[in-house]
């Protein structure tokens, strides 16, 4: 079973935005979650550190990190987890939260037809996610 890990992160003690951590008191529940649950640690913005990686390692949870639409953030998150993930870091799960039709159109068009910056970036992040899934993190 997989669970999103954000509800087990103390949102008042991390550099993440309010959506990436619990600010309603659910974070202590991490002590009650069975250790055979795979946590999905999602962060979509660039940070200098990702303390949830350290937290999940310290608490003995296997976890994957999850990115979305910012290539620099995806790469920084992967680099951090690769350096700090000791025994429990299991890989990368790419998320996609909308805009699938324009993104797919971008991926099949030639470069002369690719105009919209946001769609281009979004598609490139998906391409990066697919590449990582195919060849691995190294």
Role assignments for model-derived ranges:
Residues 1-138:
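Substrate-binding groove of N-acetylhexosamine-processing glycoside hydrolases
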